From Swiss-Prot:
InterPro entries named in the record: ATP_synth_B-like_membr_sf, ATP_synth_b/b'su_bac/chlpt, ATP_synth_F0_bsu_bac, ATP_synthase_B_chain
Molecular-function GO term, any one: proton-transporting ATP synthase activity, rotational mechanism
Protein name from the UniProt record: ATP synthase subunit b
Compartments where located: Cell inner membrane
Source lineage: Bacteria, Pseudomonadati, Pseudomonadota, Gammaproteobacteria, Moraxellales
Keyword Transmembrane helix in record: yes
Function: F(1)F(0) ATP synthase produces ATP from ADP in the presence of a proton or sodium gradient. F-type ATPases consist of two structural domains, F(1) containing the extramembraneous catalytic core and F(0) containing the membrane proton channel, linked together by a central stalk and a peripheral stalk. During catalysis, ATP synthesis in the catalytic domain of F(1) is coupled via a rotary mechanism of the central stalk subunits to proton translocation. Component of the F(0) channel, it forms part of the peripheral stalk, linking F(1) to F(0).
Amino acid sequence: MNINLTLIGQAIAFAIFVAFCMKFVWPPLINAISERQRKIADGLNAAEKAKADLADAQAQVKQELDAAKAQAAQLIEQANRRAAQLIEEARTQATAEGERIRQQSKETVDQEINAAREELRQQVAALAVDGAEKILNQQVDQQAHAAMLEQLAAKL
């Protein structure tokens, strides 16, 4: 009976030990485990939130980068259009200036031609008068007249 009584004594001691552990040891352990689980869950939630925030930030950065690229492309296009417009304006002005210079040169050449013609007319008239005077002052001689006309033609 000692074995049975020992077994019952051990069972009672074990029951007291379990009751003591349930009363004094178990609650702090459960609290520590719960706190640890809560911290881990909070950390995982924070990591998920940070991951979502990172994805949002990356999307926002991509949108801003795309907008900046579009704006830069638009500015470049505007600059190219303005450059083409300036080139076309310069070309038009150069063409107009060239036409004006050509017209002015033509007018100058026409004036010089008219002045030369007028001078030539005056010289021809003077030569004709000289020739007529010589013919009238000299005798009527066919060969002399022909020689004088050749001289007049050579002077022209």
